[in-house]
């Protein structure tokens, strides 16, 4: 563990005039939390965040490389920044995140977009104030990518985007090497934070009024490996459940091969652990699962889901599914559809397979044509949505405890929040309810949300 050196914050040069920054984030919740830390470091030095990129004196793109589409968005946005840089030569453009960690990517960026000022990767984001200082004082272009993961850095300032719920990372990296995935290459090997550091962060959040914590990790079930103190993920959950003032606890992501029954029992037994599990299946075909290097088969996954439902009757499942993986036949795809119907997910992140350089799947034979991928994707989404509608319909007439998160995105006159099992609910109420737990009766089920009314 390394303690963040806050002295480097003192090196950020006071700029004349506007001190606004803009951060655009692509990718997962881990990236979102990384952006909150970048924002925290800048706000510690008097910078203000703006939602208007044209107003910013610092623009940061926190990138993702899980799919080609995310990379193309970065290239497109960089191209549009050229005019802004020409109008304001003092504009500082910084790129970070998983895309930058890929071999040769930083050099490609600087070749195509020479007006970029700072490039850094996933392992050294805590050094951003140092890089910014060098650009401001020395007028140099900074590119620094660490090939290997560093020790975990504690104490980095963080600017939370919500006053009600927060992400807390418990581990970094992944050791699984699924054949389609770049995460182990760009996020490094698994490293776990010390349990006392996690507990202290959560206690500080609770004392500041936060009600819900989501524990993050590429594979939270691997938590504890390599720590001096012997501790499992289930034991960590039970320890956090004892923190006074915490109302709700969630976690993601779980790998089906590593989700043990002691974690299931912890969810069953602990009053603060929410009845919701994100359990990526990726495919319902055993042949495809083997090609993906997932280390479980369809039967094992279904048995695990069945056991979870037996122990936690109100549980909801969400998942990740990829269609169009190399060699996927129509029969393989139909097995995925059948699994989706059997499990009946309450939410799903569905993806068309995207070839990624330097992954084994990219070199596999029988790559699927795009038109076939898109056809299967549309059929998958339809099957998933059918299950979601059934689950939402079953909620009608029931009363749920809802944590009020804020006003609805679609209607500022309505409040929005989630049930313990992660159902999104919109309802009428006063803004004083934000941050509180309220009882809501569901009066209407919509396709992807519920409509309710507050009950006394």
Curated annotation (Swiss-Prot):
A single GO cellular-component term on record: cytosol
Domain TRAM: 393-456
Catalytic activity: N(6)-dimethylallyladenosine(37) in tRNA + (sulfur carrier)-SH + AH2 + 2 S-adenosyl-L-methionine = 2-methylsulfanyl-N(6)-dimethylallyladenosine(37) in tRNA + (sulfur carrier)-H + 5'-deoxyadenosine + L-methionine + A + S-adenosyl-L-homocysteine + 2 H(+)
Source organism of the structure: Clostridium botulinum (strain Eklund 17B / Type B)
Subunit architecture: Monomer.
Binding site for [4Fe-4S] cluster 1: 28, 64, 98
Residues reported to bind [4Fe-4S] cluster 2: 174, 178, 181
EC number(s) on file: 2.8.4.3
InterPro entries cross-referenced by the UniProt entry: Elp3/MiaA/NifB-like_rSAM, Methylthiotransferase, Methylthiotransferase_CS, Methylthiotransferase_N, Methylthiotransferase_N_sf, MiaB_methiolase, rSAM, rSAM_horseshoe
Keyword Metal-binding: yes
Enzyme class: transferase
Cofactors required: [4Fe-4S] cluster
Cofactor binding, note field: Binds 2 [4Fe-4S] clusters. One cluster is coordinated with 3 cysteines and an exchangeable S-adenosyl-L-methionine.
Upper classification of the organism: Bacteria, Bacillati, Bacillota, Clostridia, Eubacteriales
Domain spans labelled MTTase N-terminal: 19-137
MF GO annotations: 4 iron, 4 sulfur cluster binding; metal ion binding; N6-isopentenyladenosine methylthiotransferase activity
Keywords for this protein: 4Fe-4S, Cytoplasm, Iron, Iron-sulfur, Metal-binding, S-adenosyl-L-methionine, Transferase, tRNA processing
Domain Radical SAM core: 160-392
Function: Catalyzes the methylthiolation of N6-(dimethylallyl)adenosine (i(6)A), leading to the formation of 2-methylthio-N6-(dimethylallyl)adenosine (ms(2)i(6)A) at position 37 in tRNAs that read codons beginning with uridine.
Protein location: Cytoplasm
Secretion signal span: none
Protein name, UniProt field: tRNA-2-methylthio-N(6)-dimethylallyladenosine synthase
Family, as annotated: Belongs to the methylthiotransferase family. MiaB subfamily.
């Amino acid at each position: 563990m390394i303690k963040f050196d806050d002295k480097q914050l003192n090196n950020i040069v006071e700029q004349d005039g506007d001190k606004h920054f803009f951060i655009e984030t692509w990718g997962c919740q881990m990236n979102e939390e990384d952006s909150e830390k970048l924002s925290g470091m800048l706000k510690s030095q008097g910078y203000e965040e703006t939602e208007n990129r044209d107003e910013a004196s610092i623009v940061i793109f926190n990138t993702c490389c899980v799919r080609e589409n995310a990379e193309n968005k970065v290239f497109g946005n960089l191209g549009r920044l050229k005019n802004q840089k020409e109008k304001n030569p003092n504009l500082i453009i910084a790129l970070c995140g998983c895309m930058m960690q890929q071999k040769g990517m930083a050099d490609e960026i600087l070749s195509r977009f020479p007006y970029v000022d700072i490039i850094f990767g996933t392992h050294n984001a805590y050094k951003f104030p140092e890089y910014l200082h060098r650009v401001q004082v020395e007028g140099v272009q900074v590119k620094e990518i660490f090939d290997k993961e560093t020790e975990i850095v504690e104490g980095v300032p963080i600017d939370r985007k919500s006053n009600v719920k927060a992400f807390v990372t418990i581990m970094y990296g992944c050791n699984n090497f699924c054949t389609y995935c770049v995460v182990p290459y760009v996020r490094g090997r698994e490293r776990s934070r010390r349990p006392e550091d996690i507990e202290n962060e959560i206690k500080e959040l609770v004392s500041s009024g936060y009600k819900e914590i989501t524990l993050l990790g590429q594979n939270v079930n691997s938590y504890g490996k390599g720590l001096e103190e012997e501790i499992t993920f289930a034991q960590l959950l039970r320890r956090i459940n004892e923190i006074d003032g915490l109302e709700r606890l969630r976690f993601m992501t779980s790998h089906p091969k590593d989700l043990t029954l002691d974690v299931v029992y912890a969810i069953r037994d602990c009053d603060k652990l929410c009845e919701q599990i994100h359990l990526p299946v990726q495919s319902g075909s055993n042949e495809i699962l083997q090609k993906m290097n997932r280390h479980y088969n369809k039967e094992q996954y279904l048995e695990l889901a069945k056991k979870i439902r037996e122990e936690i009757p109100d549980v909801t499942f969400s998942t990740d599914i990829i269609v169009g993986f190399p060699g996927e036949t129509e029969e393989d795809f139909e097995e995925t559809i059948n699994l989706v119907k059997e499990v009946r997910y309450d939410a799903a992140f569905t993806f068309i397979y995207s070839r990624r350089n330097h992954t084994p799947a990219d070199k596999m034979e029988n790559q699927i044509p795009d038109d076939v991928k898109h056809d299967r994707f549309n059929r998958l989404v339809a099957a998933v949505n059918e299950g979601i509608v059934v689950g939402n319909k079953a909620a009608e007439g029931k009363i749920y405890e809802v944590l009020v998160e804020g006003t609805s995105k679609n209607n500022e006159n309505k409040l929005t929040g989630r049930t313990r099992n992660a159902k999104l609910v919109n309802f009428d109420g006063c803004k004083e309810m934000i941050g509180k737990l309220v009882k809501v009766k569901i009066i209407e089920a919509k396709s992807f949300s519920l409509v309710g009314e507050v009950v006394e």
